[in-house]
Amino acid sequence: METITITTEFIKLQDLLKFANLVSTGGEAKQLILDGQVTVNGEECLMRGKKIRPGDVVAFDGGEYTVAYED
């Protein structure tokens, strides 16, 4: 499992996918989320604006990513 480190209290799911270079565009992230291809903490998430916080686990395209905070 890879770790994605953020420097804010939370990051929106769509922004996290772009920030971690898992997708190349926001439009691609939006479509993948709406198609149900992304899970958050083991549950399908269709909300691209969902707040992802440190400790959350995002799974996409066979990979799992945990979110950590660093200031």
Show the residue positions of the predicted features.
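Short, Lys/Arg- and Gly-enriched loop/turn segments at beta-strand edges
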Residues: 64-71
